[in-house]
UniProtKB/Swiss-Prot annotation:
Residues 211-225 have a biased composition (Acidic residues). This is Nucleolar protein 4. It comes from Mus musculus. Keywords: Nucleus. It is found in: Nucleus, Nucleolus. Residues 210-418, 435-483 are annotated as: Disordered. The gene is Nol4.
Length: 483
């Protein structure tokens, strides 16, 4: 009895919230019911609002009458409200009008309960509950203005039906807790017909979802514990290494200068550091240096996996520099310094050679004019032009080689490990872009200097031709008086 009272209270509250006077639904509350009865009896006052309501009452076909049980008894009882409803028989398509009793919202529980629970011959209730289709069919044959949603809600709140629908693989009885479940009702669509198979399916789905939630919560707790311990160990190892790696692009960026030789030296030093670090990481055993070099090349050829986080052992082994690595770094740095000196000497010779050629060209021109030797001036002019062209070609080749070498050194001297953060990658990219812009500016300056030198050469050639022509005419004029 307590479960029935709780069910009545919950269902009644839901009905009043859903189908009350405030909600615009196709239902009839007690207040609206009394107003319709007054309008049909002629006691309702006329107004604009009543005119609309009166039109609605006439369009629906409400009328007063006596219930069937009162008609059989023949006694004069209170009249009830009926409405005309179009019905069809099961065989034909012909429609006919029949009267249905108007169901009041406040009486929904009693109406559905009387149709849902079967009664015995003596009026006693049998513990047999009908399904949704059966209950709604019995209600629709006698009542109107009672939606299917209310029937579905009632069946979902019925504790007896819930016990019957509850799955029991062991065959044991279940205890009635007196409270209908609320989780299932939120998952059900009340506007669709619900069968026993559908209810069992929804029940199984609910049980499976609860089991999945429990398992996922346990697994997530275990994963959080293991992940937190693992990440704390990795972060402690990564902190020092990341700081060193973040400082390296800044130092390289600060040491760059407008001079190409300074940039090449910085690129060589960074390349030496990276090669020494890789050699120190992969060459742990000092006994076999050739095998260490092979393994280093094989590991450099392997692609970097950016998704996997490196372990602490790998990070410490990659960034450990031992004595052998420092010796190799010093040797390699000495070789780079010697190469750098050779490049500087070549560039100094190349830069001095054009000035020397110009001075020799001027001196040759003056000597040819003074002496009047046509062959010597022509030969010297040709030789100076050839030397000047050769110096320009060699200078261009050296410059292009130096630019390509600087690009390769700048590219190879900045290896990007998989664990670098976005800030470090951005700083490396910014330094590379700045060095590239400087190289482009230098190339533009060199091209401009070459373009300015080309017209000067063209001007020198006509002057040489005029000088030779003048020297050729002078001996001719001197020979004429002798002839």
């Amino acid at each position: 009895m307590e479960s029935e009272r709780d069910m009545y209270r919950q269902f009644q509250d839901w009905c009043l919230r859903t189908y009350g006077d405030s909600g615009k639904t196709k239902t009839v509350t007690r207040k609206k019911y009394e107003r319709i009865v007054q309008l049909l009896n002629g006691s309702e006052s006329s107004s604009t609002d009543n005119a609309k309501f009166k039109f609605w009452v006439k369009s629906k076909g409400f009328q007063l009458g006596q219930p069937d049980e009162v008609r059989g008894g023949g006694g004069g009882a209170k009249q009830v409200l009926f409405v005309r409803v179009k019905t069809t028989d099961g065989v034909g398509v012909d429609e006919k009008l029949s009267l249905r009793r108007v169901a009041v919202v406040e009486d929904f529980f009693d109406i559905i309960y009387s149709m849902h629970v079967e009664t015995g011959p003596n009026g006693e209730q049998i513990r047999k509950h009908a399904g949704q289709k059966r209950t709604y069919k019995a209600i629709s044959e006698s009542y109107a203005f009672l939606p299917r949603e209310a029937v579905t809600r009632f069946l979902m709140s019925c504790s007896e039906c819930q016990k019957r629908m509850h799955l029991n693989p062991d065959g044991t009885d279940h205890k009635d807790n007196g409270k209908p479940p609320t989780l299932v009702t939120s998952m059900i669509d009340y506007n669709m017909p619900i069968t026993m198979a559908y209810m069992k399916h929804m029940k199984l789905q609910l049980l499976n979802s609860q089991q999945d939630e429990d398992e996922s919560s346990i697994e997530s707790d275990e994963f959080d514990m293991s992940d937190s311990t693992r990440m704390s160990a990795v972060n402690s190892d990564l902190s020092s290494n990341l700081e060193e790696r973040m400082q390296s692009p800044q130092t390289v960026h600060g040491q760059q200068d407008d001079d190409s030789a300074a940039e090449s030296s910085n690129g060589n030093e960074t390349l030496g550091h990276s090669s020494a670090a890789s050699g120190g990481a992969h060459g742990r055993e000092p006994e076999d240096s050739s095998s260490d070099g092979k393994t280093g090349l094989e590991q450099e050829e392997q692609p970097l996996n950016l998704s996997d986080s490196p372990s602490s052992a790998q990070l410490t082994s990659e960034f450990r520099i031992d004595d052998q690595g420092s010796d190799g770094k010093n040797k390699y740095k000495n070789l780079l310094i010697s190469d750098l000196k050779m490049e500087r000497e070549a560039r100094e010779n190349g830069s001095k050679s054009p000035a020397h050629s110009y001075s020799s060209y001027d001196s040759g021109k003056n000597e040819s004019v003074d002496r009047g030797a046509e062959d010597l001036s022509l030969n010297r002019g040709d030789e100076d032009e050839d030397e000047h062209d050769e110096h320009e070609d060699s200078e261009k080749v050296n410059e292009t080689d130096g630019v390509e070498a600087e690009r390769l050194k700048a590219f190879n001297s900045r290896p990007i490990p998989s664990h670098l953060t976005s800030a470090v990658a951005e700083s490396i990219l910014a330094s590379a872009c700045e060095s590239e812009s400087r190289n482009a500016a230098k190339r533009m300056r060199l091209d401009k200097a070459q373009d300015e030198a080309a017209p000067a050469d063209k001007q020198c050639k006509p002057e040489a031709a005029q000088a030779t022509y003048s020297t050729a005419t002078v001996p001719g004029s001197q020979e004429d008086p002798q002839i």
